[in-house]
């Protein structure tokens, strides 16, 4: 199988059920969050293009988002998912072939999205530069998450701890 990476993904429980039923989870344009204008859609399309350029085949689908570098926390989920946690989400812990994992800097990605929204007026640093998966949290995009890779699924609390 080659080199593997340990990753975590936050997914709605409906997508976890899809993963269990179909044996894999792939990105779908219908699951890309909506935004004012088309900023998020353009960002996801740019990520798909960057993945293809890096040799990660996407078949034209948006990525499955994951995290590497260190285990994720409930606080990470609250920060990244926000209010929709109340509708039922889980953390999927899995390993994936390194060749299918495109890791990039999340801060630079957010700067890029902010520019797509036109809120910064600043040209962001290159966000699509491959980033090593070390000990710091890094975003990882994959074309697929296979059920065979899953180590554990942890349901997330539906509200913030008191």
Predicted regions and their residues:
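Conserved NAD+-utilizing ADP-ribose enzyme module
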Residues: 2-5, 13-38, 60-62, 71-162
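Short, well-structured hydrophobic secondary-structure segments
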Residues: 39-74
């Amino acid at each position: 199988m080659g080199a593997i990476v340990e990753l975590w993904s936050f997914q709605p429980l409906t997508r976890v059920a899809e993963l269990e039923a179909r044996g894999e989870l792939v990105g779908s344009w219908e699951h890309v969050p909506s935004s004012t204008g088309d900023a998020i859609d353009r960002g996801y399309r740019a990520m798909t293009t960057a993945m293809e350029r890096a040799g990660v085949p996407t078949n034209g689908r948006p990525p499955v988002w994951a995290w590497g570098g260190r285990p994720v926390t409930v606080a990470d989920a609250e920060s990244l998912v926000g209010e929709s946690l109340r509708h039922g989400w889980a953390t999927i812990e899995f390993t994936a072939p390194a060749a299918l994992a495109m890791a990039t800097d999340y801060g630079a990605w957010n700067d890029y999205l902010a520019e797509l929204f036109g809120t910064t007026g600043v040209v962001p640093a290159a966000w699509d530069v491959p980033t090593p998966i070390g000990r710091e949290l890094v975003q990882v995009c994959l074309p697929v998450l296979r059920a065979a890779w899953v180590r554990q699924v942890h349901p997330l609390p539906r509200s913030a701890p008191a």
